[in-house]
Amino acid sequence: GSDYNLTLNGMGGNSIRYYVDGIPMAAKGESFSLENIPASIVDRVEVYKGVVPAYLGGDALGGAINIVTNESKKNYYDISYRVGSFNTHQVDFNAQIIEPKTGLTFKPSVGYNFSKNNYTMKGVRVLNPEKNEFETGDFKRFHDDYRSVFAQFETGFTNKLWADFLYVTASFTNVDKDIQTGATQDVVYGAAHRKNRSWNLGIRYRKKNFLAEGLTLSANASHTWQKSTTVDTAMVIYFWNGHHRPADYAELN
């Protein structure tokens, strides 16, 4: 759930473009990113430094990262569960079912991530109410939960005379993130949080040797609805020990 900055050729931020199967990742909304894409759907990761292939259709100065999902032509089921430090849990499920007579394909995918992020902050300042002065100590982060859900369903046809594939896709992404600190660790929050939700509908098509040998037609279209909310209603000031006192303004103001 932490912010990240990936650098290629000394450039980062908007100088790098991210894609999933050649489609801009941003098409699924801001809540869908590298940190919450289900690992089990990834077949390989293509990294391009500097020059970006024409089929990606991007103009990134630093380069591009294209995540290629499982392209198997067989039925499969894949489920995984991972656990890590600071009460981190990750669950992924994806499958592919192909109807043998018609070639109609169904591809459901679900990913869930959760972490408390309650690691220890060392040498932070807290208010001692008895002495009415600040003291230094080590305290765990108490308001830094991260939770994300990604669900996608694809259906379409593969390996037809008229198409290598034609898929219609519907997806939903939800990210809930507590806000623990401000620009520095001296500013502590205990109630404010952010929510991001995205709904996406899309269609993608590809046909090699379209009308002529060596000519490939690739097309995609999508529409995304997105809602971002910052909740900041607590009129209090928090300290690293979890205690708080009343204030005349909200936390993020």
Residue map of PLM features:
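Hydrophobic, lipid-facing positions within transmembrane beta-strands of outer-membrane proteins
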Residues: 4, 63, 89-93, 147-153, ...
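Short acidic/polar hinge/loop motifs at secondary-structure boundaries
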Residues: 23-49
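Periplasmic-side early beta-strands and strand-to-turn transitions of outer-membrane beta-barrels
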Residues: 82, 101-186
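Outer-envelope beta-barrel architecture signal
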Residues: 16, 73-77, 89, 100-108, ...
